[in-house]
Amino acid sequence: MKSHSLAIAGLLSQYLPENAITGVLANIAVETGGSFDYTQKQKNGPGYGLFQFDYQKPYYFKYLEKEGLNDSAESQVMFMADAVYNNKSDAEGNYTGALDLGGPARKAIQKSFNEGSTADVTKTFSEKYEKPSKPNMDERLKSAEDFDKFKGLFTNPLSLP
């Protein structure tokens, strides 16, 4: 089920600030080998989906069940956005979101999304959320540079001529 990068950018624009879209999209491009397929499986590994969920996979499927959602590109983006932006905890101070990245990681990603350059967003998201065994950072940064040429078009891709 291949999705075009513009469709994924449109989904990201519903949950992330404009500043973050190209950096996250670049990470997805590398994670999926350019397919942008939310069912993409890692070759010889456990990774799955747009973000190649590895350790996150059981948390993701629990999130789907709890929220009554089906697996989809949008559900994966929603799960990622929840992990980044959900700062809620219970009365004892235990984190209540679907995936606990840790407060410092969440804050670093949020700050990068709001204030960082495309390169900063790309690196921070890779290091604090994706946590790949092989970062391929040069490839991520090159992809971000390519997507950055279209920055500003991602907020409402359906309005393109």
Regions found by a protein language model. Give the residues of each.
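Extracellular cell-wall/glycan-interacting regions and their flexible linkers
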Residues: 1-25, 135-161
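Short, functionally critical alpha-helical segments immediately adjacent to catalytic or ligand/cofactor-binding
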Residues: 19-35, 80, 123-126
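Active-site or metal-binding loop neighborhoods of secreted/extracellular toxin and effector enzymes
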Residues: 107-157
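Peptidoglycan-targeting cell-wall enzymes and recognition modules
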Residues: 1-15, 32-117
